[in-house]
Each structure stands twice: as structure tokens, then as C-alpha cells.
Amino acid sequence: MARIAGVDLPKKKRIEYGLTYIYGIGLFTSRKILDKVGISYDKRVHELSEDEAAAIRKEIQENYMVEGDLRKQVAMDIKALMDLGSFRGLRHRKGLPVRGQKTKTNARTRKGKRKTVGAKS
């Protein structure tokens, strides 16, 4: 099993899809990396030689922010929005949708389980 950027890639998948298991690398970026390194998209992860895996590791390390560093950067960006007091920061703080979706109905993922308000007994 190839280990790249601290992630074990699935052995039997094609390398272009295997790289997408790394946080911060999607299909487009995966193909860009493979083009730059000169590896075919059709190659399977378990078919990679040690030199090819090292070349992919080097390319990702030098040119892309992935995994822990990227997660940390995203968290810091959200914290900065909240500290600024921007509209988006307030929405993050309140746990509501940030991108203008309606909230009278739906938005359950962000709002959580329904809470009954003002039930009379």
C-alpha cells in the first residue's frame, strides 16, 4: 500500500482516483500532478514503483497544501471571519448556513435536531 502525504492509498484503485483520498486533492489536481510527474492515469496504486511514489510525494510536498496543514489553514480562515465580525463569521458562529440558503425550512445539517419552542401544556 502506497503511503503519500500521511495517507494510505487503496491498492487496487487507479492512481488518479487513489490520490483523491488525500484531503485537498481532487480529481483535477490528481491528474495535474500525474501529468507533471509523467505517470499514466491507468496505472494502479500497487503497480507504482518506489521512484514514482517518491516523485508524487515530492510534487505534492513542494506545490500543494494538503491534509493537516490545509485543515489548519481552513480553520484559521473561519476563525478570522468570526473575529472580524463579518456576516459570514456571524453565520459560522451561530451555526447557520453561510452561503445565503433559506432557513425557515431545511438547513437541518447546520442547525441540528429540531427544538420545540413554546409548547403549552
Swiss-Prot record:
What Gene Ontology terms describe where this protein resides (cellular component)?
Answer: cytosol; small ribosomal subunit
Record InterPro entries: Rbsml_uS13_C (IPR027437), Ribosomal_uS13 (IPR001892), Ribosomal_uS13-like_H2TH (IPR010979), Ribosomal_uS13_bac-type (IPR019980), Ribosomal_uS13_CS (IPR018269)
rRNA-binding found in the keyword field: yes
Q: Does the keyword Ribonucleoprotein apply?
A: yes
Q: Tell me the keywords, alphabetical order.
A: Ribonucleoprotein, Ribosomal protein, RNA-binding, rRNA-binding, tRNA-binding
Give GO MF terms, alphabetically: rRNA binding; structural constituent of ribosome; tRNA binding
Q: Which SUPFAM superfamilies does its entry note?
A: S13-like H2TH domain
GO annotation terms (biological process): translation
Q: Where is this region: Disordered?
A: 95-121
What NCBIfam families does the record tag this protein with?
uS13_bact (TIGR03631)
Q: Which PANTHER family match?
A: 30S RIBOSOMAL PROTEIN S13/40S RIBOSOMAL PROTEIN S18, SMALL RIBOSOMAL SUBUNIT PROTEIN US13M
Task performed by this protein: Located at the top of the head of the 30S subunit, it contacts several helices of the 16S rRNA. In the 70S ribosome it contacts the 23S rRNA (bridge B1a) and protein L5 of the 50S subunit (bridge B1b), connecting the 2 subunits; these bridges are implicated in subunit movement. Contacts the tRNAs in the A and P-sites.
Q: How does it assemble?
A: Part of the 30S ribosomal subunit. Forms a loose heterodimer with protein S19. Forms two bridges to the 50S subunit in the 70S ribosome.
- Family of this protein: Belongs to the universal ribosomal protein uS13 family.
**Protein name, UniProt field:** Small ribosomal subunit protein uS13
Provide the species name: Campylobacter jejuni subsp. jejuni serotype O:2 (strain ATCC 700819 / NCTC 11168)
